[in-house]
Design a protein with these regions (language model features):
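Structural motif corresponding to alpha-helix initiation and N-cap regions
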Residues: 6, 49-53, 59, 121, ...
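Short amphipathic alpha-helices and their capping/turn segments at secondary-structure boundaries
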Residues: 50, 55-71, 192-193, 251-255, ...
Length: 464
C-alpha cells in the first residue's frame, strides 16, 4: 500500500459509489485521511438518514472533519427508516454535542431521545451545529420543524443563553426548500428567515414557499428600518434575495429593510397557498423605496399563479399599478407583469408613457401576462422606448414579452398534430407574430433582442 502513488489512490476513491465506504476511507490511516478528507468533506451531499449517520460517525471519530465542510447539500432528502451504525460510545458523544447546544436539561433529554428514535430533523440540526466553517447550505425543511429553527436562531443570538452554537459565521449562501410528503409541503415565515439575515457573511438567500401574513400594523416594517439605522448590527450583508412560490402580503418589508446593499430581488408570487393573499404591488413599492439606488435586478413575478379569489376573498389588488421605476437608477434587469408595469386602468392607453417610467440604466425588460388585446398598446409603448434609446436607453439590450398568444386547441388543423402520438404542439398565433413584426424590425435596427413567449408554447419558453 505504501508503494502505491497518491494519484492512483485518489483514482480508486473516485470510483467508491457507496457513501459509507467513502467516509470510512478517511479513517483507514493518516495517509488516507490527508488524501480524502478535504476532497470528500469539503463538498457533501446527503440524501437520507443512513448517509447522514455514516457521515456523523466519521466526524465523531475525527471531529476536525466538521470544520472541513464548506458546501453542504441536504436539498434532495428522501425520508426512509435507517439502521443506526453508531456504537454506544459514538452515541454518547452525540449526546454531549446535543447538550452543548441545548438550553435546558429537558431539551437535551428530548434531543437525545429523538436521535435514538431516528428523528431526521434532530440529526440534521446536530450536524449543522458542528459545521462551523460552512460557506454554502442547501436545506430541505421537514413539514414540522423545531430543532432547525433553534439552531439558526441560537447561532445569531448565542449571547442570550450559555450555549455553544457559534456557527455560520462564514455562511454566504443559503438555499431553503421543503421536503415533500403525502399531504403537502410546508412553508416558512419571514421570522424563520431572519437568522440568515443576521449572519455576518451572508450574501444570498434563496427560499421556497415563504408566507408573509397580512397585518393591521402597517408600521412594523418601518420600525425595523428605523432600528436598522440606529443599530448597524441589525443591518444584513445580503445582496441577493430570491423567493419562489411565495405569498408576501406586506411586500417583504420586514426583510428588505434590513438589506441596505440589496442588489437583486426575485419574487415569484403564488395564490395556491391556504392563507394566500393577492399580490400587493403597492406594498412592494413601499418596501423598496429605500433601495432605489442599489437594486440592479427586480423580478416582481416569475410565471407565478394569480387567482381571482383567494383566502382573503376577491382578489382586487394583483392587477394594480406598481409605480414609476424612473428613480431606480441602478436597475438593469426588470421582470414584471404588464398590469403592474403600466397604469392603464379603464382606458386603452397608460396614464404615464413607458419611457417616463423606466430608468435609463435598464438593460433587459421581461413583461409577463400580456393579453392579445393589450399587445398593440404595449408594442406602441415599447416603440417609444426604442425611439428614445439613443438619448436615454443606451444600455437596453433585450425585451421579452410573455402572454396569452397561442392558438387554441380547437383551432389547430391536422397539420399541427404529431402523426405518431396524435399530440398537438401549441404555437403562437400568426396574427400575433404579424402584429409584433414592426416592433421586431425596430429592435433589429437598434440592436435590441426581442422574444415573444407563451407559457403554453414550450418552445418559446426556452431561455436563451
Amino acid at each position: 500500500m505504501e508503494n502505491i502513488p497518491n494519484d492512483v489512490i485518489l483514482l480508486i476513491g473516485d470510483h467508491l459509489e457507496d457513501r459509507g465506504d467513502c467516509y470510512n476511507a478517511v479513517l483507514v490511516n493518516s495517509r488516507f485521511h490527508a488524501l480524502f478528507s478535504r476532497a470528500l468533506f469539503r463538498s457533501t451531499a446527503l440524501k437520507n438518514l443512513t448517509q447522514l449517520q455514516l457521515f456523523m460517525k466519521a466526524i465523531v471519530r475525527q471531529p476536525s472533519l466538521a470544520s472541513v465542510i464548506q458546501c453542504l447539500d441536504l436539498s434532495r432528502w428522501e425520508s426512509a427508516p435507517a439502521q443506526s451504525f453508531l456504537d454506544a460510545d459514538e452515541l454518547a458523544q452525540l449526546s454531549i454535542w446535543a447538550k452543548s447546544v441545548s438550553r435546558s436539561e429537558e431539551e437535551h433529554i428530548q434531543w437525545e431521545q429523538d436521535l435514538l428514535k431516528g428523528n431526521e430533523e434532530a440529526w440534521i440540526a446536530l450536524l449543522l451545529s458542528r459545521a462551523n466553517n460552512i460557506r454554502q447550505l442547501k436545506l430541505a425543511y421537514p413539514r414540522e420543524n423545531n430543532y432547525l429553527d433553534q439552531i439558526f436562531d441560537r447561532a445569531v443570538n448565542s449571547g442570550r443563553q450559555p450555549v455553544q452554537c457559534h456557527g455560520f459565521l462564514r455562511l454566504e449562501e443559503a438555499y431553503l426548500s421543503h421536503m415533500e410528503d403525502d399531504e403537502s409541503k410546508g412553508s416558512l415565515s419571514p421570522a424563520q428567515l431572519l437568522p440568515f439575515f443576521r449572519m455576518p457573511s451572508m450574501r444570498k438567500v434563496d427560499a421556497d414557499t415563504v408566507i408573509e401574513p397580512a397585518t393591521s400594523n402597517g408600521d412594523s416594517g418601518r420600525e425595523t428600518d428605523i432600528q436598522a439605522e440606529e443599530d448597524p448590527t441589525q443591518c444584513s450583508s445580503i445582496t441577493d434575495l430570491t423567493l419562489n412560490s411565495s405569498n408576501a402580503a406586506q411586500g417583504l418589508e420586514s426583510l428588505t429593510t434590513l438589506c441596505p446593499s440589496l442588489k437583486s430581488l426575485k419574487y415569484q408570487h403564488s395564490d395556491d397557498h391556504a392563507l394566500a393573499s393577492g399580490f400587493q404591488p403597492t406594498s412592494f413599492f413601499t418596501s423598496l423605496a429605500t433601495r432605489k439606488l442599489t437594486l440592479e435586478t427586480l423580478w416582481l413575478d416569475n410565471l407565478g399563479t394569480h387567482h381571482a379569489f383567494t383566502a382573503s376573498g376577491l382578489n382586487e389588488s394583483y392587477d394594480g399599478y406598481f409605480g414609476s421605476l424612473a428613480d431606480f437608477t441602478a436597475l438593469k434587469d426588470l421582470r414584471i407583469r404588464l398590469p403592474n408595469l403600466l397604469d392603464v386602468g379603464y382606458t386603452f392607453e397608460p396614464s404615464t408613457p413607458l419611457p417616463e417610467i423606466l430608468p435609463s440604466s435598464i438593460e433587459r425588460i421581461y413583461i409577463e401576462s400580456c393579453k392579445e388585446n393589450s399587445l398593440p398598446m404595449l408594442i406602441s409603448q415599447l416603440q417609444l422606448v426604442l425611439e428614445a434609446r439613443k438619448e436615454r436607453f443606451k444600455a437596453l439590450k433585450r425585451v421579452d414579452i410573455e402572454g396569452f398568444f397561442h392558438v387554441d386547441d380547437e383551432d389547430l388543423d391536422d397539420s399541427g398534430a404529431d402523426g405518431a402520438s396524435g399530440t398537438r404542439e401549441r404555437v403562437i398565433k400568426e396574427r400575433v407574430l404579424e402584429m409584433a413584426q414592426p416592433l421586431r424590425n425596430g429592435c433589429e435596427d437598434t440592436g435590441v433582442q426581442l422574444y415573444l413567449r407563451d407559457r403554453a408554447c414550450a418552445q418559446t419558453m426556452v431561455e436563451v
